[in-house]
Amino acid sequence: MSRLSWGYREHNGPIHWKEFFPIADGDQQSPIEIKTKEVKYDSSLRPLSIKYDPSSAKIISNSGHSFNVDFDDTENKSVLRGGPLTGSYRLRQVHLHWGSADDHGSEHIVDGVSYAAELHVVHWNSDKYPSFVEAAHEPDGLAVLGVFLQIGEPNSQLQKITDTLDSIKEKGKQTRFTNFDLLSLLPPSWDYWTYPGSLTVPPLLESVTWIVLKQPINISSQQLAKFRSLLCTAEGEAAAFLVSNHRPPQPLKGRKVRASFH
């Protein structure tokens, strides 16, 4: 494995990441297991304020690690405010983590229970920093909204994504993707847990305020299977499916998880 060739297979998966990214063993790594008995309700946490403009979605691509929807983040068109955050955090990207079967796949775990998948909505602190790249190195630089997915009815909001997957099957492929109503993908309740953590993929930077929504959204088993049909290999390489792309929970190391709800 080299710095660039990390992944989720046996030879380059999460247990190997620390060889090139020593922060993998750091004090504020993500994901974690949320143990609800140890979580403290914090009355100072505000409700989330979310404004997402569907026209700010630009491209969907296959990174070899997930699909990514990238958003135009040149101005505050789509922003996350409130909650545990100070100032405005601009929407940058959305991606998904899943497992090889429907009974696991989320990165965060709640009281020992895994969900089928977990959507990550990545934002950066545009009030304090000039770009995502610079914000990613600062302790208050990023905010990631985590949304759990459970198996249930087909999700019509996810269909727009699953319909494009055939055109980005191989790593490195991308296609235009706009008018994506991300707000309608979120669950009705925005109750959340929050804690200081990291990116869950290399470079694993400890710059993330995590906001994990308690209420899951639905995905059908058939929709989820579409994601496993993506390849983690590029055109011309020996094809390998991206059957699983989640990092296991990391030690809490004294961090406190707070809840916005009783």
From Swiss-Prot:
Keyword presence, Zinc: yes
A GO term from the CC aspect: cytoplasm
GO MF annotation terms: carbonate dehydratase activity; zinc ion binding
Entry annotation: catalytic residues: H65 (proton donor/acceptor)
Group of enzyme by EC: lyase
Keyword Isomerase part of the UniProt annotation: no
Listed SUPFAM superfamilies: Carbonic anhydrase
Regulation of catalytic or functional activity: Inhibited by acetazolamide.
Tissue: Expressed in thymus, small intestine, spleen, prostate, ovary, colon and testis.
One Pfam family it belongs to: Carb_anhydrase
Functional description taken from the UniProt entry: Reversible hydration of carbon dioxide.
Family, as annotated: Belongs to the alpha-carbonic anhydrase family.
Cited PANTHER family: CARBONIC ANHYDRASE, CARBONIC ANHYDRASE 13
UniProt-recorded name of the protein: Carbonic anhydrase 13
Organism from which the protein derives: Homo sapiens
